[in-house]
């Protein structure tokens, strides 16, 4: 109630929830409020999960528990991050890179997936050459029927978040996966 009073007293109607976010360039394309892309209870039914830029256990312990349940049921988890964080679950593929290389690492996986699925690669990605590990991760993600891609706090607060989000959205479209 006190916070509402402060806003009323200052005649402000602007409240921003993106406290640590650095890249706002995608705001003109965003509609609605960012969300998980599915109800929380559906996380344990996923069979393929791509986690991008997240200290999952620290930032989202409830989601980590649900994803561990999914892994116990046979889900495959892939991670693209700049820290080799222990998720306390088996991870089928990892791409651990410098923070500045996070968008490029995700783009390589996107190109590998597009080539695997015979999808035309956008011109922005035309010169990207994925590695064998990128193809492995792409094939793993493509082999599932119920997948999701999650952008963690590190990705959301990354200086190139709009690029990460656009690439993740493209991957989700190719896979028919949910994005959150």
Whereabouts are the PLM-identified features?
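Catalytic alpha/large subunits of respiratory electron-transfer oxidoreductases
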Residues: 1-180
């Amino acid at each position: 109630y006190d916070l509402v009073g402060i806003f009323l007293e200052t005649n402000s109607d602007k409240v921003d929830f993106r406290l640590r976010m650095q890249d706002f360039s995608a705001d003109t394309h965003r509609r609605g409020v960012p969300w998980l892309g599915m109800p929380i209870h559906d996380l344990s039914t996923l069979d393929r999960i791509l986690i991008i830029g997240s200290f999952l256990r620290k930032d989202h312990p409830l989601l980590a528990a649900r994803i561990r349940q999914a892994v116990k049921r046979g889900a495959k988890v892939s991670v693209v991050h700049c820290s080799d964080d222990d998720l306390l679950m088996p991870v089928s593929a990892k791409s651990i890179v410098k923070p500045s290389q996070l968008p490029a690492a995700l783009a390589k996986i996107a190109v590998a997936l597009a080539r695997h699925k015979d999808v035309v690669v956008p011109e922005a990605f035309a010169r990207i050459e994925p590695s064998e590990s990128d193809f492995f991760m792409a094939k793993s993600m493509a082999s599932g029927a119920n997948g999701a891609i999650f952008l963690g706090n590190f990705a959301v607060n990354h200086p190139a978040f709009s690029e990460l989000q656009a690439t993740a959205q493209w991957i989700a479209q190719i896979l028919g996966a949910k994005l959150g």
